[in-house]
Amino acid sequence: MTLRLRIATFNLMTLDDRRELRPSLEERIPILRPQLVRLDADILCLQEVYGQHERGKKIRLSALSRLLENTPYEGYRRVTTIDPATREVSERHNLVILSRYDILEHDQYLHEYAPAPCYKKVTALPEESEAMPITWQRPILHAKVGLPNGMVVDVINLHLKSRRPTNIQGHRLPDKSWKTASGWAEGVFISSMKRIGQALETRILIGRLFDEDPYSLIAVCGDFNEELDEVSIEALRGDVENTGNMNLAMRVLVPTERNVPEPARYSFLHNGKGKMLDHILVSRTMLAYFRGTEVHNELLHDTSMVFPERIFYPESDHAPVIAHFELPEKRIKRQTEEGGE
């Protein structure tokens, strides 16, 4: 007998219950809930889960709880990122990991391994007098999930900074367009710094997991806002072709979507072009049990085409991605655990 394990990632696109949102949460739930059920996930990583205020209470993820009602995920273990300042969930862009199996421990990382770099904007108006820290807002969420066979999977949930340019003082017009191309270019540059900085911090975390156990079962999931051949994901993967060091071969992370035929390999549509922005990267030990990937993109809408009055579709603008594994019934002992090297 083998243990089936399905790991999924899904950016829910601004999951919130604010009254001014169109479509409303009530309109979105009947659309999103069947999508979640179809995933049939044992571990589910979610992005863009918003927090809700209740009078006299802490911010809660009540919109997510409503979405999960009457689904298998309603009873799953749940861990989330929190705002370091308030120690509560944030109002925006929370990460969530749901698990059928026990979550043995969890943590989040925000500038713990990669301090914020300092940078002085070159196009800002008025001119900046000194370099300022470039921080990224979204933490890394890490959970150790204990499987029934005694094996432990390190699950990392990520939402990397988008390509949307960071604001540059003095370079935006009232209609939010850019006054200058150079201001836009610097905004894109700073956003790239944030995205690659998040990837660097994640890669340092991955290195520490491998230091603890060279055979770690690792799955890095989420909305990376980049395709496979771009810098942030190359930093996460750590390919031997880039490091030039064969001794690091066991520390490479492998993209699971590569077994999806290229015409169907996209999780986001923009201007008629499909892009694979959502990924599940796994360690080589995890790859041994990998059986296939699904990308549920049948109902994706093109994000450049919205209703005339800017009322958006109830579906997310990202497709969920699922990786399927079959693990042994019992935990396999490695040579190092038996006293030999």
Where are these regions (language model features)?
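Stable alpha-helical elements in mature extracytoplasmic
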Residues: 28, 32, 60-63, 195-198, ...
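Metal-dependent phosphoester-hydrolase catalytic domains
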Residues: 90, 101-109, 113-125, 129, ...
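Catalytic metal-binding/acid-base residues of hydrolase active sites
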Residues: 13, 49-50, 159-161, 224-227
